[in-house]
Amino acid sequence: MSSGGLLLLLGLLRVCAELTPVSSKDPYCNLPPDPGPCHDNKFAFYHHPASNKCKEFVYGGCGGNDNRFKTRNKCQCTCSEYP
């Protein structure tokens, strides 16, 4: 791995460490993906607890629940046990 890649990885790990609560992951990380009642077709990410991975789904743009993230990285930092 190049030194630039290593620095990027270390930076991401630091961000995850700052964003991840020490106690445990947030309870909404176990909720199923909810597209909501609207039909805007935006791509978002949700935490899939059985696989401990963040997966993409289509969000309608309104409503839904809190297990919804704009980026995979934010989802992993918030919900994954091992980001």
Curated annotation (Swiss-Prot):
Primary localisation category: secreted
Disulfide bonds: 29-79, 38-62, 54-75
Domain BPTI/Kunitz inhibitor as annotated: residue spans: 29-79
Stored SMART domains: KU
Gene3D superfamilies assigned to the protein according to its UniProt record, in alphabetical order: Pancreatic trypsin inhibitor Kunitz domain
Subcellular location: Secreted
Signal peptide: 1-24
Database matches in SUPFAM superfamilies: BPTI-like
Superkingdom of origin organism: Eukaryota
Function: Beta-bungarotoxins are presynaptic neurotoxins of the venom. The B chain is homologous to venom basic protease inhibitors but has no protease inhibitor activity and blocks voltage-gated potassium channels (Kv).
Assembly mode: Heterodimer; disulfide-linked. The A chains have phospholipase A2 activity and the B chains show homology with the basic protease inhibitors.
Record-linked PANTHER family: BPTI_KUNITZ INHIBITOR DOMAIN-CONTAINING PROTEIN, KUNITZ-TYPE PROTEASE INHIBITOR-RELATED
Family, similarity comment: Belongs to the venom Kunitz-type family.
Protein name: Kunitz-type serine protease inhibitor homolog beta-bungarotoxin B6 chain
